[in-house]
Design a protein with these regions (language model features):
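Tandem CBS (Bateman) regulatory domains
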Residues: 1-6, 40-94, 101-120
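Oxyanion-binding "anion nests"
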Residues: 1-38
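Short loop/turn microsegments at loop-to-beta-strand junctions
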Residues: 28-29, 93-95
């Protein structure tokens, strides 16, 4: 699981181009979007990117909040990995943010990490 400075996060005012840099730098295929209090308000994924490219939205002027998945699926630290895997399979997503009870991000992981850990 990625934590701390490895956690892919952008501010709600970030441009899409900035979110793409965060996705590329952190290598998880998504980034969380947080408000000014550090609360997760959405997730921007490579799937969101494909949709905005199809809609011909300008990556350098659009903000990530205009195109993100609002809310997004999350898990909590105490949830079992197999339960998180079931959530991912049910919703056909490949990565999850881990949040505390106030929806502040504390970690993130993807299917590859679960496979490497022997959960799959």
């Amino acid at each position: 699981m990625l934590t701390g400075s490895e956690l892919p996060l952008v501010d709600e005012n970030a441009l899409v181009a900035e979110a793409l840099l965060e996705i590329s730098n952190k290598g998880l295929g998504m980034t969380g979007v947080i408000d000014n209090q550090g609360i997760l308000i959405g997730i921007f994924t490579d799937g969101d990117l494909r949709r905005i490219l199809d809609a011909r939205i300008d990556l350098h002027t659009a903000t990530v909040t205009q195109v993100m998945t609002k809310g997004g699926k999350t898990t909590m630290p105490e949830q079992l990995a197999v339960e998180a895997l079931n959530l991912m399979e049910t919703h056909k997503i490949s990565a999850l943010m881990v949040t505390d009870e106030t929806r502040k991000p504390v970690g993130a992981f993807n299917m590859h990490m679960l496979l490497k850990a022997g959960v799959l």
